[in-house]
Amino acid sequence: MTRPVRTRFAPSPTGFIHLGNIRSALYPWAFARKMKGTFVLRIEDTDVERSSQEAVDAILEGMQWLGLDFDEGPIYQMQRMDRYREVLAQMLEQGLAYPCYMSAEELDALRERQREAGLKPRYDGTWRPEPGKVLPEPPAGVKPVLRFRNPLTGTVVWDDAVKGRVEISNEELDDLVIARPDGTPIYNFCVVVDDMDMNITHVIRGDDHVNNTPRQINILRALGGEPPVYAHLPTVLNEQGEKMSKRHGAMSVMAYRDAGFLPEAVVNYLARLGWSHGDAEIFSREQFVEWFDLEHLGKSPAQYDHSKLSWLNAHYIKEADNARLAALAKPFLDALGIEDAAIATGPALDAVVGLMKDRATTVKEIAEGAAMFYRVPAPDADALAQHVTDAVRPALADLAAALKAADWTKEAVSAALKATLGTHKLKMPQLAMPVRLLVAGTTHTPSIDAVLVLFGRDVVVSRIEAALA
């Protein structure tokens, strides 16, 4: 009988979470949703010195922003210490683990001798009980570590959903330390107990964990558990071809929100960063879940491409509802010093956003473009001298008069502009540039007729006439 699918995301809260980390949440989330299974969030916080609540909060915030909802959790390893100690005691009782009194200095000396002899450094089993073997006398006052009795013969085999069949000889594996001298269990042991207790069926994680897998499988089997399906994802590289990391300049997940990216764009981009469905580049979260499978996970490292993410974000911005974008743009406008009163008395923000979004790759860019509608213009003096010349002033005066009488629609404003151009034998830039400067304070705007309509007749006419006075 096939077990119900249960996946997990098990981050360590020791720093911010970047795109490479969160991809290891996205894929198991999508697989659980596709298979109508359960997605578990587990916080692996046994590294007490480096773990922090701030990092946990960042994980939760990032997942919430991207819509990666979990069915169980967060489950904290530090809250499961009694369970780990229970299993350790059981393993000692059953002879699956044993105390080892070899000091760190002795272990270092052993490894050095092995290296000098051209051997792979490894624990030599000095304290491993065997039939007929006489163990050394435990040194007084020394607390031992606990080691797992790894099988001495045979091979650990698993069919990795990404790497294919993997075989590791047990002769390559020494007896892993599973508890420190103070009794606290180590990471590889806790993971096994958690995966077993939580009935995890599929472990989708980065391939930096692949070396842990044979050890975890051996411990799991010793405890009577059934190994899950493993899928070890190739590394995500940054744009320089290095492993994505904080040290190499990776941004945190929430930094993308703060830069004006939409969560659906980030999810779409992350989905393609190591998985594919034919040539499909743009797809919804629902489509991704429907299509997702383990068979099409990439086998080579995926390289982050910021321009590709920006392209996707621009697409989703164009598709987004103006009211939603306006709400998202508001904090960016606040940061630009645009006051609520200016927005309340100025053009409708929804409409401004609707005009600006086709030119933007981020919500931040929308806000930067929208700010001109809520500021008193302060055009550059050199630009004014260049564009608002004596030759163009009569045309500006006629345009102001025409706009006073025109219907206030884009079509009517466009007609007034064209009529003024014809009367004064000017080309559009000769008139549009000074109008942009006087009304908006900049020469960089969308279509001039659309911009003027949003500013409103009174503002447009008064600003042109004030410059001519």
UniProtKB/Swiss-Prot annotation:
One GO BP annotation of this record: glutamyl-tRNA aminoacylation
Molecular function per GO: ATP binding; glutamate-tRNA ligase activity; tRNA binding; zinc ion binding
Binding, ATP: K246
Residue spans crossing the bilayer: none
Motif 'HIGH' region per UniProt: ranges: 11-21
Cleaved signal peptide residues: none
Pfam families documented for this protein: Anticodon_2, tRNA-synt_1c
Cellular component GO terms, alphabetical: cytosol
Job of this protein: Catalyzes the attachment of glutamate to tRNA(Glu) in a two-step reaction: glutamate is first activated by ATP to form Glu-AMP and then transferred to the acceptor end of tRNA(Glu).
EC number: 6.1.1.17
Similarity comment: Belongs to the class-I aminoacyl-tRNA synthetase family. Glutamate--tRNA ligase type 1 subfamily.
Gene that produces this protein: gltX
Leading EC class: ligase
Entry-linked HAMAP family: Glu_tRNA_synth_type1
Subunit structure: Monomer.
Catalytic activity: tRNA(Glu) + L-glutamate + ATP = L-glutamyl-tRNA(Glu) + AMP + diphosphate
Keyword line: Aminoacyl-tRNA synthetase, ATP-binding, Cytoplasm, Ligase, Nucleotide-binding, Protein biosynthesis
Compartment annotation: Cytoplasm
Protein name: Glutamate--tRNA ligase
Provenance organism: Burkholderia ambifaria (strain MC40-6)
Sequence motif 'KMSKS' region, location on chain: 243-247
Disulfide pairings: none
